[in-house]
Each structure stands twice: as structure tokens, then as C-alpha cells.
Design a protein with these regions (language model features):
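Non-catalytic terminal accessory/regulatory regions of metabolic enzymes
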Residues: 1-85
Length: 85
């Protein structure tokens, strides 16, 4: 199941986002994960990877998009937020 979560007005360094995405992607049951700022270019990359859901498509350039494809994405989305805190 594909799930996106948008955190409005949250900006993070791309290196930090890649580290969290790698940890989320390594979880059991997670097929793929990405965390990106909601710029048009980043949303295009998410779409090409098959990770852009309607919620993520509505993200603005100052928003964080957390994208997860997993059997149960809720736990992965929540862990991503905790790791960024």
C-alpha cells in the first residue's frame, strides 16, 4: 500500500532526509521509502518512482513529503516523524 504524509512548512536538509529514508526503507515490510521537500522537481522524482500519492501531489515547495510503500505504512510514517524530531 502506498501512503504519503505531508508536513506543512517543514524543511530539512536533504542529507538528513536521505538518512531517514534509508532507515525506513530497511524496515521489515517496507518496499520503498522516500522523504523529500515538495518542490515540483522532487514531486516528479517521486512520481517516476511510483511513490507519489494524491496527498503528496498537493505538497507545496516548503512542505515535507514522506512517501512509503509498505504492507502497513502507518508505523513507517510515524517512525520517520520521530527520527526527524
Amino acid at each position: 500500500m502506498l501512503a504519503n504524509r505531508v508536513e506543512r512548512g517543514r524543511y530539512f536538509d536533504s542529507v538528513a532526509l536521505m538518512r531517514v529514508a534509508r532507515r525506513i526503507g530497511a524496515l521489515a515490510g517496507v518496499e520503498d521509502a522516500a522523504l523529500m521537500i515538495g518542490t515540483p522537481a522532487n514531486k516528479a522524482l517521486l512520481a517516476q518512482a511510483g511513490l507519489l500519492a494524491p496527498e503528496g501531489a498537493r505538497a507545496e515547495p516548503n512542505d515535507l513529503v514522506i512517501a512509503v510503500r509498505a504492507a502497513e505504512p502507518t508505523a513507517a510514517l510515524e517512525l520517520a516523524l520521530r527520527l526527524l524530531a
